[in-house]
Amino acid sequence: MAMAGSSVAQKTWELSNNMQEVQSIDEIYKYDKKQQQEILAAKPWTKDHHYFKYCKVSALALLKMVMHARSGGNLEVMGLMLGKVDGETMIIMDSFALPVEGTETRVNAQAAAYEYMAAYIENAKQVGRLENAIGWYHSHPGYGCWLSGIDVSTQMLNQQFQEPFVAVVIDPTRTISAGKVNLGAFRTYPKGYKPPDEGPSEYQTIPLNKIEDFGVHCKQYYALEVTYFKSSLDRKLLELLWNKYWVNTLSSSSLLTNADYTTGQVFDLSEKLEQSEAQLGRGSFMLGLETHDRKSEDKLAKATRDSCKTTIEAIHGLMSQVIKDKLFNQINTA
């Protein structure tokens, strides 16, 4: 019974995150040093600022990053990723946490973190892990996957001296709330580069106190298409992990775990609605300002979408609790 429950929970997680199994382990795990050196020498990303379009993340690296991000609670955490490049795809094979000081708005890497980073990569090579550092990750607890002004500056610096390099952002709070990993992979454009108009990107809820930071820098980077993969070896490791942790799915509730997050969402939504109402009220006294009205209506539409998202997540959490109550607390003894 326990094994069956574990299997169902694992399958649900894999389907939610579109996890793909690699048939041949050697196909993606084999490290071709000569090929990687040729790519580094050619530097095709210098000719095309939008060269890298895809990012593949191994299931093991994904779990390590999400568990690390979750352990930080409301504080941001930071880590490094190891991997390689295959054409227009950046492949993340592994990840490790960095000993950094985190706050609710940023992570501060000190000298000890850089020493730890260098020692880890060197020791990894000594045990046969030949992949190089391919990027860094950090968490945005509760406010979505995007790059702030500090993140953009950090990534620009990394791309200047450590190419190829990718920035990954994880939101552990929304991951628990939605039941699906909330992760984004990004690369920045060089200073002074104006990207072509790519049309509207996928909508995501941004808290009111973060909107300005998001809007100012959103044209300085682009998102890569992220997919996840696992090998037969990963499958064995995942089974061991799920056998240990699957009970947490039944014993925990997103309504209780994310109570502070949900409350914060409601407060943020009320502020957005008040702001939209005030702007619409001012617009009614200002003649000939159709652009102003359109912007106000656009903000109101976004606030409506945010309210729908919060409501759906709350309903899903409530439905989950009702189902568990029916299963375990109302057993018919007749």
From Swiss-Prot:
Alphabetical list of Gene3D superfamilies matching this protein: Cytidine Deaminase, domain 2
Database matches in CDD domains: MPN_RPN11_CSN5 (cd08069)
PROSITE patterns (UniProt xref): MPN (PS50249)
Biological processes, Gene Ontology terms: negative regulation of apoptotic process; positive regulation of DNA-binding transcription factor activity; proteolysis
Entry keyword annotation includes Hydrolase: yes
Names of the cofactor(s): a divalent metal cation
SS bond partners: none
Molecular function in Gene Ontology: metal ion binding; metallopeptidase activity
Keyword DNA damage: no
Domain MPN: 55-192
Binding, Zn(2+): 138, 140, 151
A Pfam entry, by short name: JAB
Motif (JAMM motif) on chain: 138-151
GO cellular component: COP9 signalosome; cytosol; nucleus; perinuclear region of cytoplasm; synaptic vesicle
InterPro entries: CSN5_C, JAMM/MPN+_dom, JAMM_MPN+_peptidase_M67A, MPN
EC number: 3.4.-.-
Additional notes on this entry: The CSN complex is associated with some 'Lys-63'-specific deubiquitination. Such activity is however not mediated by the core CSN complex but by the brcc3/brcc36 component of the BRISC complex.
Similarity comment: Belongs to the peptidase M67A family. CSN5 subfamily.
PANTHER family: EUKARYOTIC TRANSLATION INITIATION FACTOR 3 -RELATED
Record note on quaternary structure: Component of the CSN complex, probably composed of cops1, cops2, cops3, cops4, cops5, cops6, cops7, cops8 and cops9.
Described function: Probable protease subunit of the COP9 signalosome complex (CSN), a complex involved in various cellular and developmental processes. The CSN complex is an essential regulator of the ubiquitin (Ubl) conjugation pathway by mediating the deneddylation of the cullin subunits of E3 ligase complexes, leading to modify the Ubl ligase activity. In the complex, it probably acts as the catalytic center that mediates the cleavage of nedd8 from cullins. It however has no metalloprotease activity by itself and requires the other subunits of the CSN complex.
Domain description: The JAMM motif is essential for the protease activity of the CSN complex resulting in deneddylation of cullins. It constitutes the catalytic center of the complex.
Official protein name in the record: COP9 signalosome complex subunit 5
Organism classification: Eukaryota, Metazoa, Chordata, Craniata, Vertebrata
Gene: cops5
